[in-house]
Curated annotation (Swiss-Prot):
The gene is pat. It holds the Pfam family Aminotran_1_2. The modification N6-(pyridoxal phosphate)lysine is found at residue 213. GO terms for molecular function: aromatic-amino-acid transaminase activity; histidinol-phosphate transaminase activity; pyridoxal phosphate binding. InterPro entries: Aminotrans_II_pyridoxalP_BS, Aminotransferase_I/II_large, ArAT, HisP_aminotrans, HistidinolP_aminotransfase, PyrdxlP-dep_Trfase, PyrdxlP-dep_Trfase_major, PyrdxlP-dep_Trfase_small. It comes from Corynebacterium glutamicum (strain R). This is Aromatic amino acid aminotransferase. Aminotransferase that catalyzes the conversion of aromatic amino acids and 2-oxoglutarate into corresponding aromatic oxo acids and L-glutamate. Its EC number is 2.6.1.57. It is an enzyme of class 2 (transferase). Keywords: Aminotransferase, Pyridoxal phosphate, Transferase. Belongs to the class-II pyridoxal-phosphate-dependent aminotransferase family. It catalyses: an aromatic L-alpha-amino acid + 2-oxoglutarate = an aromatic oxo-acid + L-glutamate. PANTHER family: HISTIDINOL-PHOSPHATE AMINOTRANSFERASE, HISTIDINOL-PHOSPHATE AMINOTRANSFERASE 2. The lineage of its organism: Bacteria, Bacillati, Actinomycetota, Actinomycetes, Mycobacteriales. Its cofactor is pyridoxal 5'-phosphate.
């Protein structure tokens, strides 16, 4: 009755929650949606008896202007994760291959396997970054899609422009590269590729961004993809109808039009991020989290939970979200208490 291969597909595990605890496990922002977004949601719900605009025309028009692309070069989805899945479905058939770094966004292998494709995970380098040489070497005649997560989740590292340029020289034109920039707004790296530029250099690059992180709309689920219009059209073909509801579209549009206010909030997170990096002694990060590689993540998570802090433990290390001043102070007090004991 059920597909036999589903038994081999891992289940996506969200960040842990604890009642009355500070949740630093899902890379969410701590502030509420922008006031304009809240007002837009309130107004949009008045028409909740009607289906949303399936084409999200107004939002896509605004995004096209924001990204400086044509209307048919951008689409929206139920979070950038859904768009990642659509990209897999649009490019891969049974037995095709999807290459991605590991550890990275844990849904990549799930999306590949659900589509009947073969996930090809390439370990990160010793400094927790993409091994682009190894990823390029892994390309075969079955490769259809490559994900690059920049900044990478959970390590927070970024690749350089030269590294990406060298990598793209080795990627066949018929292999799509999904440049996942979910944490783009937090990225302060001077030397790194940016999808809005790369899509004009390479017809096989698709940019992926989200309103779930910096924009504070994780609960509404809106992401966007942009690039080659032919690939975007294929992604739309495999999308679930009416996937982005009216309230989500309205909130995303209002947030996009309040960029200055948004960036003030982002700068607070970046400031606190640098303080956490210094206090915990982690490597620099270009996202809204820090990464502590190595064993002992589960033990650290348990100790922080005793102090009312929830983080994300992976087999390879621990990821801790960075939010505002209040939650950062609580984290640092807990860290000091643990290390003093």
């Amino acid at each position: 009755m059920i597909r036999a291969d589903l038994a081999t597909i891992p289940t996506y595990v969200p960040g842990r929650r604890l009642n009355n605890a500070t949740k630093l496990s899902s890379n969410e922002v701590s502030f509420s949606p922008l006031p304009a977004a809240v007002d837009a949601v309130t107004e949009a719900t008045q028409g909740a008896n009607r289906y949303p605009d399936m084409g999200a025309v107004e939002l896509r028009e605004a995004l096209a202007e924001h990204l400086e692309v044509e209307f048919d070069q951008v689409t929206v989805g139920c979070g950038s994760s859904a768009l990642c899945q659509q990209l897999v479905q649009a490019t891969c058939a049974q037995g095709d291959e999807v290459i991605f770094p590991w550890r990275s966004f844990e849904a990549y292998p799930i999306f590949a396997q659900v589509a009947g494709a073969t996930p090809v995970a390439i370990p990160l380098t010793a400094d927790q970054n993409h091994d682009l040489d190894a990823m390029a070497a892994a390309i075969t005649d079955k490769t259809r899609l490559i994900f690059i997560c920049n900044p990478n989740n959970p390590s927070g590292t970024t690749i350089t422009q030269a590294q990406f340029d060298n990598f793209m020289e080795k990627v066949p034109n018929d292999v799509v590269v999904g440049l996942d920039e979910a944490y783009f707004e937090f990225n302060r790296a001077d030397d790194t590729p940016v999808a809005t530029e790369e899509i004009h250099r390479h017809d096989n690059v698709i940019g992926l961004r989200t309103f779930s992180k910096a924009y504070g709309l994780a609960g509404l689920r809106v992401g966007y993809a942009f690039g080659n219009a032919e690939i975007i059209a294929a992604m739309n073909k495999v999308a679930i109808p009416f996937a982005v509801n009216s309230a989500a579209q309205a909130a995303a549009l209002a947030s996009l039009n309040s960029a200055d206010e948004l960036m003030e909030r982002v700068e607070e997170t970046v400031e606190k991020r640098d303080a956490v990096v210094a206090a915990l002694g982690t490597a620099p990060t270009q996202a809204n989290f820090v990464w502590l590689p190595g064993e002992g993540a589960a033990e650290l998570a348990a100790k922080l939970a005793e102090h009312g802090i929830v983080i994300r433990a992976f087999p390879e290390g621990a990821r801790i979200s960075v939010t505002n001043a209040e939650e950062t102070d609580k984290l640092l007090r807990a860290w000091e208490a643990i290390n003093a004991g």
